[in-house]
A protein has these predicted regions:
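Alpha-helical membrane segments and adjacent membrane-interface helices in multi-pass membrane proteins
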Residues: 55-114
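Hydrophobic alpha-helical transmembrane segments
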Residues: 17, 42-47, 67, 82-86, ...
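Short helix-perturbing small/polar motifs within transmembrane alpha-helices
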Residues: 27, 106-153
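Hydrophobic cores of alpha-helical transmembrane segments in multi-pass inner/ER membrane proteins
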Residues: 18-25, 111-120, 189-203
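Membrane-helix interface motif
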Residues: 151-164
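C-terminal transmembrane helix-loop-helix hairpin of multi-pass membrane proteins
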Residues: 135-142, 146, 163-214
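Structural signal for the C-terminal ends of transmembrane alpha-helices
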Residues: 25-35, 120-125, 205-209
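Hydrophobic transmembrane alpha-helices
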Residues: 2-72
Length: 214
């Protein structure tokens, strides 16, 4: 889920270049912000990145797979969570899950789920137990990620910058609409699965390792 399995040469050049620029800008800012973090935080980043990589390699149906992005966002926060998303997407690209040119866009799409997860969880945790708060956090985080994915698809369907600025590509808009209509049921299925997994893991951590939770 929330990952573009698109080969190199398909997306407009300007789009994936912008994706790389934004992804590396966010990664540089996160690296600078966390430059004095404790070593165990980096260990947790590596461990959760490995879990995310494994989850994203196992499909649960057409078009979708688990991502563990909400869980990673809750445990690591927006900055380290985005670094995990970037590293995982780069590794998946080397394994053939999408081209190298879409790594930046994939990091942004997955980062859209990671970044809001901890703030939303903290807000919900004031009124809910960890498991239930995690489930609702997963739904909200993945909604942001799917929205980012649809934005990328819509921009890709517009083709070059001239078509985008002219806003006259009706065929591209229709193609985007068909994709949204076709894919929505699969996103719902994946979101439910992600919410259940996130809820289960957070409930477990709350009992055995509560210090890991924000």
């Amino acid at each position: 889920m929330t990952h573009l399995h698109i080969a190199d040469g398909v997306l407009p050049t300007w789009l994936w270049i912008v994706g790389f620029a934004l992804a590396f800008a966010f990664a540089a800012g996160a690296s600078f912000h966390h430059r004095h973090d404790r070593p165990d935080r980096l260990t947790l980043l590596a461990a959760l990145g490995a879990v995310m990589l494994l989850a994203m390699s196992v499909p649960i149906g057409p078009l979708v797979h688990l991502s563990f992005a909400p869980m990673v966002g809750i445990l690591l926060g927006p900055g380290l969570g985005f670094l995990a998303a970037l590293l995982v997407n780069a590794t998946l690209a080397l394994l053939g899950h999408g081209g190298l040119t879409v790594v930046g866009l994939n990091a942004l799409v997955l980062g859209a789920a990671v970044a809001p997860a901890r703030p939303v969880y903290r807000l919900l945790r004031k009124r809910m137990k960890p498991g239930r708060a995690g489930a609702f956090t997963a739904v909200a985080a993945l909604a942001c990620s799917v929205a980012a994915l649809y934005v990328v698809i819509a921009l890709a369907n517009r083709g070059d910058l001239a078509s985008l600025l002219a806003d006259d590509d009706h065929a591209g808009a229709q193609a985007t609409g068909r994709f949204v209509l076709f894919s929505s049921p699969f996103w719902v299925l994946a979101t439910v699965a992600e919410a259940l997994v996130t809820s289960s893991v957070l409930s477990f951590l709350a009992r055995v390792r509560p210090e890991l939770l924000p």
